[in-house]
C-alpha cells in the first residue's frame, strides 16, 4: 500500500524513453509518438545512441548523459538489457519506471535493484498508462482517450485495449487508465490508495485475474470504497480458466466474499463490464432503491420490469399527489401507474411534461426513461426534450436518471446527446436494469458494512484450553481429529456436541449401547476415510443389540472390501439425536490459497462442492456478518427449510458461526473443520459429526487471514487516580451506542477543540467511521469502565497512519467530567507505544492555541509544539523511530 513514487508515476513532470526509435513498429517509436501526441506538457527525452533526434526531439545517447533526472522512465529496449538500464536509472535518481517486457527469471534482480534505489516499477509486461488530465499517454495504445472521472486498472493488456477501443467510440473519458502487467512492484492496492485521494477520480473499475496480497487488497479496497464506488470484473472463475491464465487465484466464492466484505461490487461478464463503465461514468449516486419507469410502449417497460423482478429490485409506488399531477399533464387515456406507459404515439412534449411532473415528486429514487423508435416521436426530439427538462428543473441536477433509447441506427444521435449531457444511456431495457441494480447492490454492500453489529447473547471462548488440546494432538502425531477428539475443542468455544464413546469392536459397541440406551448411532472410525458415507460408515436408529452387532460387523467388512489399505481404529457410538422436525446443516472451514480461511454454510451432501452448495464468508465474523451469511445461504437456496417443523433460528445460527469464526481466528493450527451434520432444531444446534484437520503453525497467526481480527493482546487494565479500574482496549464496531453516550457527556467546548467546528449531531455514518475501523490502517483505544449496571466509555484516542506507515495523525478525547484523573495521558501513552511498535516514524496532531491542557500534555510527553497564531492552530509532532 506504499504511495512512495506514485506521484512521479501518475503525475510526472518529465519522462525519459529508453530505447527510443525512428523505426515505426518498434516499441520506442510507438511510445514516443503517443507521448508527443498526448499533449504532455513536460519534457520528453528520448534516449538512444542510434539517432540524433526522434520525431523531432533531441535524443541523448545514454541515461548518464541526460541533462536532468526524469520523474518517469519507460524501458522500450530488448528485455535482456533491463537490469543494466534499471541500475543506470537508479544511479541517476529516477523515481519510477515502466517496464514493457521482461522474463520471469529477471524479476528477483529487478526488484532488488529497484528497492536499493527506492524506485517504483510498473510492470513488467505492462501496456503502460494513460492520464488524460496530465496529457499523458505512456502506453502502446494509439487510441486517444478523453478526460473523465473514471479510473480503470487492468491486469490484462487485451482487456485494456478492448475497453479503450469501446470507450473511444463512445467518447467516454477516464481520469487514469493503468495496465499493471505482472505487478512485480506496484499493485492494485497501491493504486487504490492513490486514486481514493485523487480529486479527478470519482469511481474506479478493476479487471483482475489474481492477487499477490489479499489482505492488502481488501484493506485498500475497503478504504477507497467508502468514498468512491468500485466495480470489479474477475476472470478465472473455473480451474480451466485459471490454468489458461497461469494463475492460481483461489476459489471463486472466496472472491465474492472478499469483494462484498470490502464494499465493492462484482460484475460477471464483458457485457456487464461495458454497462458498468457507462454507469460509473455518468450515473449519480443513489439515495435509495425505488425505481420509476416511463416508456412510450408497454413491451419495453415489461422487459425492464421482468429484469427488475428477477434481480429483486424495488418499484416505486406513486402518491395520489403525483398521480393527479400526471393526469393533468398527460392526454386522456394514459394509464397513470408505474411503469408509466405514455403510449407509442407519445410526442417529445408528452415526455417533457411527464418528466417535469416526476421531477417534482419524491416517490422514487431513480427514474428510467425508455424510448422505442416511433414515427410519431423521433428519438432525437424526445432526447432533447428530456435533456431540456432536466436542465431547467431545480431538481434536475439531483435526480438519478437512466435512459434507454432502443434501436441502433435511429438512436445513435440520441445516445450521443445523452453522453454529452452526462446522462447514462443503455441499448436495452434489461441492460439498463442490470446497471441500476449494480448501483443498488453497491449501496447495499456499503450499508451492510456500516450497520452496527448487535451483541451476541453470550460467547464462550477458552482459548488456552483449545490450544492445549490441539498442541497435544500435534505432539502425538495426529493430523486429523474425529468427533470424540474434537468435541472438547468445540465445547471450549460453546459449540454443543453429542457425547461420544469409542468401541474397539462390535462387542464393545453393543456393551456401550446397552449402557447409554437405545436408539444409538454407529460410526466408523478411520483416519483414511474422511467421508464415512462413501462406505456406509454411518448407521442410525439402531434399536437393539442385534442391530448394533450386525451393523458394526457389516461396516467393518465393507471397509475391508472397498478400502483394504484403510486403517480401522474402531467404532464411535452416540445416543441418537432427536431429528424429528430438525434441519441438517453443514459448516465447513477451508483454507483458500489466496484469501486464507473461509467459513462455508450449506446443507451438505456426499458430492459437496462449495462453489455450488455453500454461502461463503471471510473470518472474522461479528453477529451482523454472520447473519448476512445465513440470509445469503437461504436467499440463494443453499439452505432450504423443506423439512423443519420449526423455523430456523437465524440469530442462534449466527451466534454459532461467530463462535466458529473465533475458534478459527484463535487457533491457527486448524487447517480444516467440517461439521456435518449440524442439527438445527429451533434454537438448539448440535454438531453430530465433526472432522478437524490440523498441522503445526509458527509465526504470526494473523498473517493467514485476509482481514486483521480484533487484537485481543492490546487489552490492558488500568487504575485511574480515583482508584477506579478501566479497560483500555481497541474500539469495536459494537461500541457505537456507547460512543454516542460518551460524546453526550463531552462539553461543546471540548468537542470544538477536538473537531475544530461546532457539531450538533453525529450521524450513524459518522459513528460507523469511528468504530468500524481497519486495524491494519488505524487504531483507536477506548477506556471502558464496567459495573454491574452498565459499561461506559470514558475516553478515546486514535491514530490513522498514511499508506507508507511513516506518519500517523492522532487525537485524544476524555469525558469532560473526568479530567484530572490522568486518563488522557495514559491513553496517549498507550497510543504512542502502539505506533512505535508498528514502525511509524512520527506522530502528528493539531489543536487550538487556547487548548492549554492538550498543549501541556504534549510537551510532557516529548512532542514538539509549534504555535501558528496566524492559522489559529498548534502543530504537535513526536518522533518515534528515527535513527
How does the language model describe each region?
Residues 698-883:
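Long, contiguous binding/interaction regions
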Residues 691-693, 878:
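Short, basic/aromatic-enriched C-terminal tail that caps enzymatic domains
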Amino acid at each position: 500500500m506504499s504511495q512512495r513514487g506514485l506521484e512521479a508515476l501518475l503525475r510526472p513532470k518529465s519522462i525519459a524513453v529508453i530505447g527510443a526509435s525512428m523505426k515505426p513498429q518498434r516499441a520506442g517509436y510507438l511510445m514516443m509518438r503517443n507521448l508527443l501526441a498526448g499533449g504532455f506538457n513536460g519534457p520528453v527525452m528520448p534516449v538512444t545512441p542510434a539517432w540524433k533526434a526522434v520525431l523531432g526531439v533531441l535524443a541523448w545517447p545514454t541515461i548518464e548523459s541526460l541533462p536532468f533526472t526524469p520523474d518517469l522512465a519507460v524501458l522500450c529496449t530488448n528485455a535482456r538489457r533491463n537490469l543494466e538500464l534499471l541500475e543506470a536509472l537508479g544511479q541517476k535518481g529516477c523515481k519510477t519506471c515502466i517496464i514493457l517486457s521482461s522474463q520471469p527469471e529477471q524479476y528477483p534482480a529487478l526488484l532488488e535493484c529497484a528497492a536499493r534505489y527506492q524506485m517504483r516499477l510498473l510492470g513488467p509486461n505492462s501496456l503502460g498508462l494513460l492520464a488524460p488530465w496530465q496529457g499523458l499517454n505512456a502506453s502502446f495504445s494509439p487510441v486517444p482517450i478523453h478526460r473523465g472521472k473514471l479510473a480503470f486498472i487492468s491486469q490484462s493488456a487485451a482487456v485494456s485495449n478492448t475497453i479503450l477501443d469501446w470507450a473511444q467510440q463512445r467518447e467516454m473519458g477516464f481520469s487514469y487508465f493503468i495496465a499493471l502487467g505482472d505487478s512485480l512492484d506496484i499493485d492494485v492496492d497501491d493504486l487504490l490508495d492513490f486514486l481514493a485521494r485523487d480529486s479527478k477520480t470519482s469511481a474506479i473499475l478493476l479487471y483482475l485475474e489474481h492477487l499477490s496480497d489479499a489482505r492488502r487488497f481488501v484493506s485498500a479496497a475497503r478504504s477507497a470504497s467508502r468514498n468512491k464506488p468500485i466495480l470489479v470484473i474477475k476472470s478465472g472463475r473455473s480451474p480451466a480458466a485459471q490454468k489458461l491464465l497461469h494463475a492460481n487465484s483461489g476459489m471463486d466464492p472466496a472472491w465474492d466474499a472478499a469483494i462484498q466484505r470490502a464494499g465493492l461490487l462484482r460484475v460477471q461478464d464483458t457485457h456487464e463490464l461495458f454497462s458498468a463503465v457507462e454507469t460509473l461514468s455518468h450515473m449519480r449516486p443513489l439515495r435509495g432503491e425505488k425505481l420509476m419507469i416511463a416508456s412510450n410502449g408497454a413491451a419495453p417497460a415489461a422487459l425492464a420490469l421482468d429484469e427488475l423482478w428477477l434481480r429483486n429490485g424495488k418499484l416505486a409506488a406513486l402518491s395520489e399527489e403525483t398521480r393527479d399531477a400526471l393526469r393533468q399533464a398527460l392526454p386522456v387515456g394514459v394509464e397513470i401507474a408505474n411503469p408509466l406507459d405514455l403510449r407509442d404515439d407519445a410526442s417529445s412534449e408528452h415526455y417533457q411534461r411527464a418528466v417535469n411532473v416526476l421531477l417534482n415528486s419524491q416517490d422514487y429514487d431513480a427514474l428510467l426513461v425508455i424510448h422505442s423508435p416511433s414515427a410519431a416521436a423521433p428519438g432525437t426530439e424526445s432526447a432533447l426534450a428530456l435533456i431540456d427538462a432536466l436542465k431547467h428543473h431545480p431538481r434536475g441536477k439531483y435526480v438519478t436518471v437512466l435512459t434507454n433509447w432502443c434501436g441502433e441506427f435511429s438512436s445513435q444521435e440520441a445516445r450521443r446527446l445523452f453522453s454529452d449531457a452526462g446522462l447514462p444511456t443503455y441499448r436495452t431495457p434489461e441492460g439498463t436494469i442490470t446497471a441500476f441494480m449494480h448501483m443498488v447492490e453497491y449501496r447495499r454492500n456499503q450499508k451492510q458494512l456500516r450497520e452496527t453489529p448487535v451483541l451476541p447473547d453470550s460467547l464462550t471462548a477458552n482459548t488456552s484450553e483449545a490450544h492445549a488440546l490441539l498442541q497435544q494432538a500435534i505432539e502425538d502425531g495426529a493430523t486429523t481429529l474425529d468427533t470424540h477428539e474434537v468435541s472438547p475443542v468445540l465445547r471450549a468455544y460453546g459449540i454443543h456436541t453429542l457425547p461420544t464413546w469409542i468401541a474397539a469392536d462390535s462387542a464393545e459397541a453393543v456393551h456401550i449401547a446397552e449402557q447409554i440406551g437405545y436408539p444409538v448411532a454407529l460410526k466408523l472410525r478411520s483416519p483414511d476415510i474422511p467421508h464415512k458415507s462413501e462406505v456406509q460408515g454411518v448407521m442410525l436408529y439402531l434399536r437393539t443389540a442385534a442391530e448394533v452387532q450386525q451393523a458394526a460387523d457389516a461396516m467393518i467388512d465393507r471397509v475391508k472390501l472397498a478400502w483394504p489399505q484403510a486403517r480401522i481404529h474402531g467404532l464411535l457410538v452416540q445416543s441418537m439425536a432427536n431429528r424429528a422436525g430438525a434441519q441438517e446443516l453443514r459448516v465447513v472451514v477451508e483454507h483458500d490459497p489466496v484469501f486464507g480461511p473461509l467459513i462455508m454454510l450449506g446443507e451438505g451432501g456426499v458430492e459437496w462442492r462449495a462453489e455450488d452448495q455453500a454461502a461463503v464468508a471471510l473470518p472474522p465474523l461479528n453477529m451482523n456478518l454472520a447473519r448476512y451469511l445465513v440470509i445469503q445461504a437461504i436467499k440463494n437456496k443453499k439452505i432450504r427449510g423443506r423439512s423443519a417443523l420449526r423455523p430456523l433460528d437465524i440469530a442462534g445460527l449466527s451466534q454459532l458461526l461467530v463462535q466458529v469464526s473465533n475458534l478459527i481466528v484463535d487457533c491457527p493450527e486448524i487447517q480444516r473443520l467440517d461439521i456435518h451434520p449440524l442439527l438445527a432444531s429451533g434454537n438448539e444446534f448440535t454438531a453430530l459429526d465433526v472432522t478437524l484437520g490440523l498441522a503445526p503453525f509458527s509465526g504470526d497467526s494473523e498473517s493467514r487471514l485476509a482481514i486483521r481480527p480484533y487484537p485481543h493482546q492490546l487489552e490492558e487494565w488500568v487504575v485511574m487516580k480515583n482508584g477506579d479500574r478501566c479497560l483500555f482496549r481497541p474500539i469495536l464496531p459494537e461500541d457505537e451506542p456507547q460512543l454516542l453516550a460518551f460524546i453526550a457527556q463531552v462539553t461543546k467546548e471540548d468537542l470544538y477543540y477536538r473537531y475544530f467546528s461546532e457539531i450538533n449531531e453525529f450521524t450513524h455514518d459518522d459513528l460507523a467511521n469511528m468504530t468500524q475501523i481497519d486495524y491494519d490502517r488505524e487504531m483507536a483505544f477506548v477506556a471502558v469502565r464496567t459495573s454491574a449496571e452498565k459499561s461506559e466509555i470514558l475516553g478515546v484516542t486514535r491514530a490513522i497512519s498514511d499508506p507508507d506507515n511513516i506518519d500517523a495523525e492522532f487525537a485524544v478525547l476524555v469525558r469532560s467530567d473526568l479530567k484530572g484523573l490522568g486518563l488522557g495521558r495514559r491513553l496517549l501513552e498507550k497510543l504512542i507505544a502502539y505506533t512505535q511498535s508498528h514502525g511509524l516514524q512520527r506522530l502528528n496532531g493539531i489543536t487550538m492555541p487556547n487548548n492549554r491542557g492538550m498543549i501541556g500534555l504534549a510537551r510532557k510527553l516529548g512532542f514538539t509544539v509549534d504555535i501558528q497564531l496566524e492559522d489559529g492552530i498548534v502543530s504537535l509532532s513526536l518522533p518515534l523511530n528515527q535513527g
